[in-house]
């Protein structure tokens, strides 16, 4: 734990240094451009040298795509989100709006990116990355939108701060296969997932607002990737009204592990991720489920065959405490057309059929698939994977007993006793 805290202190210091460098003497080269000089900007990026500050003045710039690679100490700054706008709507080639690869010390802040065909900004294999005061938006939120609005992947030491993402057909703010990341004071609206932490270790997500998405916040570990995630904390977030239709691209549905599996009305979903702590969050009016904790087996019966050093399908060491959770009186309409959504509806119906005293109560706030390491070890231990819940109130928890869902005698259980923190 001391090493973890020290790492985050170092990240915070590094991030503040990179993001707050304002004087030109912090960079060997300072370049400044205005709208209408797009060709000069593209040429400058092709010949960019280490330690360069690029200032984009207020106005709208139209680009096909921009690329930066194999550099150190680079700053791209605008006049502010909504003031400096990079418009990729006429893009004729390239997937991303901005692609950054192998840059050590990269900061981008103070601008809006909009309407690329693929991801709006993808930062790959880079270190000491700061994305601040950035809006990343698609004008139309549907399956034609790019997958990720803000997308650092395979990076180290990432700070995403005071950003806004809208319209992504996968995740508005996504951090993938990264070591050490902070997402704070951001907003995500009208995406499939507001924010996703995937196969990422040592991440903190706090003081954010994720609302009006299909699902508010996802913590996923997926197979066949180069890095194992874990040690993720999410706290002081406001996740509300995430009830919208899942408009992920078709290849993201079913057993292909994509975000298409996220049911409309999901607040937080933990999938096959371990060492996770959720606390002091307000999880309000996500009307299918506040928190779901599920294994890889929940969406792929062959998950065991995918196990290796970077992937273990059972979530372990999950600590849920001191969250405020509320749901409305009914599922969102979109849930009835979604494959995972139909499962959640079935759980609620089965609980109420089993126990008329529930008087048609809603599905409990926390849903656990109940698939444990016992399926791998043939053991019989109760709560062998340390799901630890410290929450109070009625209708709090359901163990879905997902392995028996297809059986006639299937009985989900609302007994939280084995999972109350000792």
Sequence positions of predicted segments:
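C-terminal motif of bacterial Sec signal peptides marking the signal peptidase cleavage site
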Residues: 14-15
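Acidic, glycine- and Ser/Thr-rich low-complexity intrinsically disordered tracts
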Residues: 299, 303-313, 321-422
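Short, T/G/N/S-enriched strand-turn elements that build extracellular solenoid repeat scaffolds
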Residues: 41-47, 62-70, 76, 87, ...
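Right-handed parallel beta-helix/beta-spiral solenoid domain characteristic of secreted/periplasmic
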Residues: 21, 27-39, 53, 73-117, ...
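Right-handed parallel beta-helix
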Residues: 73, 77-83, 104-115, 127-140, ...
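Extracellular beta-strand/beta-solenoid scaffold signature
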Residues: 41, 88-99, 115-122, 143-152, ...
């Amino acid at each position: 734990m001391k090493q973890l805290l020290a790492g985050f202190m170092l990240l915070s210091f590094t991030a503040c240094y990179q993001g707050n460098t304002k004087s030109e003497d912090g960079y060997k080269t300072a370049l400044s451009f205005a709208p209408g000089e797009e060709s000069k900007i593209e040429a400058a990026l092709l010949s960019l040298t280490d330690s360069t500050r690029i200032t984009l003045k207020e106005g709208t710039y139209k680009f096909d795509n921009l690329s930066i690679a194999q550099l150190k100490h680079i700053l791209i700054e605008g006049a502010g989100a909504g003031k400096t706008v990079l418009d990729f709507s006429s893009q004729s080639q390239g997937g991303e709006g901005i692609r950054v690869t192998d840059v050590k010390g990269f900061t981008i802040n103070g601008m809006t990116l909009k309407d690329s065909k693929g991801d709006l900004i993808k930062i790959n294999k880079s270190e000491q990355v700061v994305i601040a005061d950035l809006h990343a938006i698609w004008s139309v939120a549907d399956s034609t939108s790019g997958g990720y609005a803000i997308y650092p992947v395979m990076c180290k030491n990432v700070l995403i701060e005071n950003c806004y993402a809208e319209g992504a057909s996968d995740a508005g703010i996504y951090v993938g296969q990264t070591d050490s990341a902070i997402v704070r004071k951001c907003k995500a609206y009208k995406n499939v997932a507001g924010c996703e932490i995937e196969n990422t270790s040592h991440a903190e997500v706090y003081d954010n607002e994720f609302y009006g998405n299909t699902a508010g916040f996802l913590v996923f570990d997926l197979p066949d990737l180069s890095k194992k995630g874990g040690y993720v904390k999410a706290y002081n977030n406001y996740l509300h009204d995430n009830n919208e239709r899942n408009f992920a691209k078709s290849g993201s549905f079913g057993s292909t592990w994509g975000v298409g599996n996220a049911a409309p009305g999901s607040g937080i979903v933990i999938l096959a991720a371990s060492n996770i702590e959720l606390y002091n969050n307000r999880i309000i009016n996500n009307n299918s489920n506040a928190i779901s904790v599920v294994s890889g087996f929940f969406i792929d019966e062959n998950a065991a065959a995918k196990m290796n050093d970077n992937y273990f399908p059972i979530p372990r060491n999950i600590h849920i405490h001191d969250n405020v959770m509320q749901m409305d009186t009914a599922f969102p309409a979109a849930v009835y057309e979604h494959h995972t959504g139909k499962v959640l509806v079935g759980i609620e119906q089965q609980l109420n059929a089993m126990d008329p005293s529930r008087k048609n109560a809603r599905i409990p706030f926390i849903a656990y698939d109940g698939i444990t390491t016992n399926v791998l070890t043939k053991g019989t231990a109760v709560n062998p994977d340390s799901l630890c819940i410290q929450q109070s109130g009625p209708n709090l928890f359901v163990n879905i007993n997902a392995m028996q869902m297809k059986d006639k005698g299937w009985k989900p259980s609302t007994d939280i006793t084995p999972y109350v923190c000792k």
